[in-house]
Amino acid sequence: MSDMASWQPSAPVANLLKRASILSTIRRFFSDRGVLEVDTPSMSQATVTDVHLVPFQTHFVGPGVAQGMMLYLMTSPEYHMKRLLAAGSGPIYQLCRSFRNEESGRYHNPEFTMLEWYRPHYDMYRLMNEVDDLLQQVLECESAETLSYQQAFIRHLDVDPLSADKTQLREVAAKLDLSNVADNEEDRDTLLQLLFAFGVEPHIGKERPVFVYHFPASQASLAQISTEDHRVAERFEVYYRGVELANGFHELTDAAEQRQRFEQDNRKRAAAGLPQQPIDEHLLAALEHGMPDSSGVALGVDRLIMLALSAERLSEVIAFSVDRA
């Protein structure tokens, strides 16, 4: 990149104008439905424990904290928004910057725009319908297909992900030429994620968005376990044209169970040689106080806009990608 060109935005100005219009459409969508827009902090003293996420860290030095207070840039506004739900906010949404210290590429930028919203008294299916409404409005696409995680595996890999053992999963991996990775992998969820990424994702959501729901209970994250089938979690993801767009939950409200999951994450981190993360005690206190039964979803806005504009890379729809920041 020449010095003369490096100052310029990564996205054409015409795309930035279209981006602004889409953001206005999103805000109007929620305003028309009586959902409150909120703003929450971009930094916190606690962070996510998820073994797959790497947060950015910084230090605050001020009165009373001369030694420095460790702060983390938020990977998602989820924890703060749940505290608002517990305080009685009602339905809320947020358009905000989120930060993840991960790869930069076609579908990734370490700083990105997140749309996250929560609906008290919605189950997972009702929220999926609302996500579908938003996608149709922004992308002018057909109504989404819905497919359970189990159905997706059986259809595309001819294996039941809820009952197959690790040997069976490795056999499927071999058919996908993934033996070099799968043969030495002992974690069942990692094997499932590998098969999903290489054996399922490339085949779904080509013509219209697809909702994949009821992920294995072991991948529940912050979602409730299904009361109808304890093998699965009330969790869904949305895919369209090769892009993962959104991740949603029927939210876990049990503080004790959530603490156990955070602690289990930290044990996994320790086993993998990763630093353990501080647990968000404020979130747990909010859950203990009582958060209404809710469903929530996080959607990648830059990816949504990329699809709406038929762009090839995120850098074509954000003003300055990390290499020009």
Swiss-Prot record:
GO terms for molecular function: acid-ammonia (or amide) ligase activity; ATP binding; lysine-tRNA ligase activity; tRNA binding. SUPFAM superfamilies: Class II aaRS and biotin synthetases (SSF55681). One of its GO terms (biological process) is lysyl-tRNA aminoacylation. Keywords: ATP-binding, Ligase, Nucleotide-binding. PROSITE patterns: AA_TRNA_LIGASE_II. ATP binds at residues 100-102, 109, 244-245, 300. GO terms for cellular component: cytosol. It comes from the Bacteria. Pfam families: tRNA-synt_2. Its EC number is 6.3.2.-. PANTHER family: ELONGATION FACTOR P--(R)-BETA-LYSINE LIGASE, LYSYL-TRNA SYNTHETASE. This is Elongation factor P--(R)-beta-lysine ligase. It comes from Edwardsiella ictaluri (strain 93-146). The gene is epmA.
